[in-house]
Amino acid sequence: MNNVLKFKIFELHCFVQKTYADIKIACDIAIYQENTSKYLISLGFLNKSYMTYIEAKRFYRENEELVSVEFDNFFDTYDKLELELKKVISTEDKNPSLLHSRFDQFQQKVENINDLIKVLQNAR
């Protein structure tokens, strides 16, 4: 694998990790916090994760050599998670069990990407 491709994979992986970190905080706040401002705080982290997600998707589309089912699944699952989190925030849902389930699915897709990156790092 050439160095340019390795750099692009690393760059996309960084976008994935940043998106994951912010959406995780947004979901954790919406699911577990017990205060009246939790939805506003969650929305802030959702916005932050969405900005990184958009940048990741742009980078992915511009670099066709990065196309893989793992990244496609990441983007599809993020879209579903984002919609569910918006629903929880907009309705101030007190029982976000579907959000929890969607986040677990998203987390699995991130783990799949992490596994792919490990395999690619070991490939010479």
Residue ranges and their predicted role:
Residues D76-R124:
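Amphipathic alpha-helical binding modules
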Residues M1-N47:
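Short terminal alpha-helical segments
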Residues K38-L43, V67-K80, F106:
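Charge-rich, acidic-biased intrinsically disordered regions
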Residues I23-S37, A56-N63, L85-P96, L120-R124:
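Secondary-structure edge/capping motif, primarily at the C-terminal ends of alpha-helices
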Residues F15-D22, F45-K48, T52-E55, T77-E84, ...:
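Amphipathic, well-ordered alpha-helical segments in soluble domains
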Residues N3, F10, Q33, L40, ...:
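Register-specific recognition of a single heptad position within extended alpha-helical repeats
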Residues Y50-F75:
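Short, solvent-exposed, charged loop/turn and helix-capping segments
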Residues M1, K6, K38, E64, ...:
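Low-complexity, intrinsically disordered short peptide segments enriched in small/polar/basic residues
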